[in-house]
């Protein structure tokens, strides 16, 4: 696994992955029409080794799974319905849910061979659950149905593991701040914080004018881990990981943890004990977020809509700016936020490839999906979404800001289950234990260091 990740990341970095997806508009041709090209031509390339034709007569059932909020659910379901109208012989069954617990359920399904035919996947799943190509099919084999020319080559390279294109990239994504300006204005502030000092000043104002229950920011364990990573990368200017080696010492991790603690101490954000006591599945499901007591979050640009869906109309929900914490670099990373893959257990991979192509590349599907999964990588899909007015301006603004700011590479081991799992992962253990005063900063730093090094080994 370690070698596969290192080789993949070397390819990604050389190609300049952080340049992002999209690009100039391209005329989309139906992927299925490309199958009409001669067999000789198709066998002379790395694309499909045989011509494929979508079955339009026999009854076929496909399954598809994804995670996300209500808006994403509605878009996927509408796109799948439109697909079945194009192919009346195909039925599409949908499975979806919130992120909490989703990866655990999907990893179990992959191991049991019961996963959906088409899966929305996190990028690191390709390495973690299919490091030898055992879980997902090689989409190069279906390039006469799924138009791979619509995707940037560097983004396809990022999804190539074990010499197999195991997913197509849906979007590039990074973390940024979103603010509820109604709460800021209630505190007498007319602008969101753009520097560390402005954030500290806002926290003081919130506490003085609104009370102890109001905070400019709320952050869970993973949010804190990513914020700390941005902070350390900005201060020291080093990538988080190089060649499967963590570039930060235990002492530097301790410094980062103490910085996170300073945000709690200065009323920037509540401690995790306070947040967990509410029993909310996510921050944005909780009353503290809905009522404006938590006035900011640090989340993926692709999550803009799901984060805002529970807010009242007068919340004045806006995307903020990235905050530069140090002088050595901007810090921070972007990644292939999610991909679409076909599982090895799928009995109808040609039709599954047609479903992915419909959702991402074809006019009707892409117009429905818009930016529900972030700013789409498909050139044709992005153009169709724009023509349909389905590009959410907030997501576009957030993604543009992220891509212009971040300057560090992303290592897929960062999201290994052993680190990221919400119940038993190292990040949750460290940040909850530290926030609950179960660990001091030195102990927490050592646990974090050891856990990361073990995941990288």
Each model region followed by its residue ranges:
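Hinge/lid segment of periplasmic solute-binding proteins
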Residues: 46-54, 122-176, 200, 252, ...
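Mature extracytoplasmic/periplasmic domains
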Residues: 135-138, 305, 338-421
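Extracytoplasmic/periplasmic substrate-recognition and gating elements
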Residues: 85, 91, 187, 266, ...
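C-terminal capping/gating helix-and-loop segments adjacent to ligand/active sites or protein-protein/ligand interfaces
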Residues: 334, 397-452, 456
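Glycine-centered hinge/linker elements that transmit conformational signals in sensory
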Residues: 203-204, 245-277, 322
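Short, well-ordered beta-strand elements
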Residues: 57-69, 90-95, 117-118, 215-217
């Amino acid at each position: 696994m370690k070698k596969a990740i290192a080789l993949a990341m070397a390819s990604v970095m050389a190609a300049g992955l952080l340049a992002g997806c999209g690009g100039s508009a391209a005329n989309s041709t139906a992927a299925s029409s490309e199958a009409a090209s001669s067999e000789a031509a198709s066998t002379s390339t790395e694309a499909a080794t045989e011509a494929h034709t979508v079955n339009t007569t026999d009854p076929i059932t496909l399954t598809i799974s994804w995670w996300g909020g209500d808006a994403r659910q509605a878009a996927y379901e509408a796109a799948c319905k439109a697909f079945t109208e194009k192919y009346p012989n195909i039925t599409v069954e949908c499975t979806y849910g919130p992120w909490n617990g989703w990866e655990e359920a999907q990893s179990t399904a992959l191991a049991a061979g019961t996963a959906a035919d088409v899966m929305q996947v996190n990028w690191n799943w390709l390495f973690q659950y299919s490091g030898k190509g055992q879980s997902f099919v090689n989409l190069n084999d279906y390039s006469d149905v799924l138009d791979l020319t619509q995707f940037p080559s560097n983004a396809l390279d990022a999804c190539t593991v074990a010499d197999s294109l195991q997913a197509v990239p849906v979007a590039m994504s990074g973390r940024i701040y979103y603010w509820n300006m109604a709460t800021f204005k209630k505190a007498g502030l007319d602008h969101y914080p753009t520097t560390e000092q402005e954030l500290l000043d806002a926290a003081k104002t919130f506490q003085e004018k609104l009370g102890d229950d109001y905070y400019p920011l709320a952050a869970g364990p993973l949010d804190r881990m990513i914020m700390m990573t941005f902070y350390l990368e900005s201060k020291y200017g080093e990538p988080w990981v190089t060649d499967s080696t963590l570039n930060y010492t235990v002492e530097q991790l301790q410094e980062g943890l103490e910085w996170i603690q300073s945000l709690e101490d200065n009323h920037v954000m509540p401690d995790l004990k306070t947040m967990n006591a509410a029993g909310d599945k996510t921050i944005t499901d909780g009353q503290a977020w809905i009522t404006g007591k938590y006035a900011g979050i640090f989340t993926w640009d692709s999550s803009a809509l799901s984060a805002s869906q529970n807010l009242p109309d007068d919340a004045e929900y806006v995307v903020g700016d990235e905050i530069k914490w140090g002088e050595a670099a901007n810090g921070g990373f972007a990644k292939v936020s999610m991909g679409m893959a076909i599982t090895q257990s799928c009995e109808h991979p040609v039709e599954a490839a047609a479903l992915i192509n419909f959702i991402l590349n074809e006019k009707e599907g892409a117009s429905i999906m818009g930016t529900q999964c972030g700013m789409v990588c498909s050139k044709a899909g992005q153009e169709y979404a724009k023509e349909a007015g389905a590009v959410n301006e907030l997501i576009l603004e957030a993604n543009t800001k992220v891509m212009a700011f971040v300057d560090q590479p992303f290592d897929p081991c960062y999201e290994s289950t052993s680190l990221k799992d919400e119940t038993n992962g190292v990040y949750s253990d460290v940040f909850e234990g530290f926030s609950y005063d179960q660990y001091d900063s030195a102990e927490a730093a050592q646990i974090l260091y050891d856990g990361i090094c073990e995941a990288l080994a």
